[in-house]
Amino acid sequence: VTSVFRAVAMLPVAVGLVLAVSAAGRAAFQEASAPPAKAARAPDVVYVPTPHDVVDKMLEMARVKKEDVVYDLGCGDGRIVVAAAKKGAKAIGYDLSRERVEEARANVKKNKVEKLAEIFEKDIFTLDLSEANVITLYLLPKLNVKLIPQLEKLKPGSRIVSHDFDMKGVQPDRMVHMTSQEDGESHTIYLWTVPLKKEPGHEPTGQQ
């Protein structure tokens, strides 16, 4: 509005000033009455980091190598992304938390893997996963199930690994129990390979 007043002040015709003030007033009213921008939704889970030795086991089970493209859905501080990039893979992390995204980007930079790793603040349920052939998860079971429609579109042979939580209605190819040397706790890692194997009597729909 200030810039409008400055421009109009230079006009020699008083009517021009009146018209400009009127237009500025309408614009200000429209801006004030416009609905507020929609805020990003809250993260789906409370962030709990995966112990580093569990991360290593997840990537080992997924057979991650430099030819792979790894997507970490709900990447937290980026430790899985960094570990995958250190194996030479292209690694991309997604998270809804601005704080976690900034932390993950800082960890990518700290570990000097910027050429292979990227972090994005995005809703994982809106993503096109077709570029990836390895997906890593540490989400709740109902969220794993909600991802099924997206996971089923992955290329054949793509691997999915989940820390601690299964995917109801889908049979894992492998399940490993381990005790972390980092936290002393027992952890379970699930591995699935695309095409996903539906368990008898179950038809996962991706609905909660």
Language-model segments: residues:
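C-terminal substrate-binding/active-site "lid" region of AdoMet-derived donor-dependent transferases
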Residues: 142-207
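Conserved SAM-binding motif I beta-strand of class I
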Residues: 90-95
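Bacterial N-terminal signal peptides
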Residues: 9-22
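S-adenosyl-L-methionine
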Residues: 25-68, 98-131
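A short SAM/SAH-binding and catalytic strip from SAM-dependent methyltransferases
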Residues: 130-146
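Conserved SAM-binding loop of SAM-dependent methyltransferases across substrates and taxa
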Residues: 77-89
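Conserved class I S-adenosyl-L-methionine
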Residues: 67-76
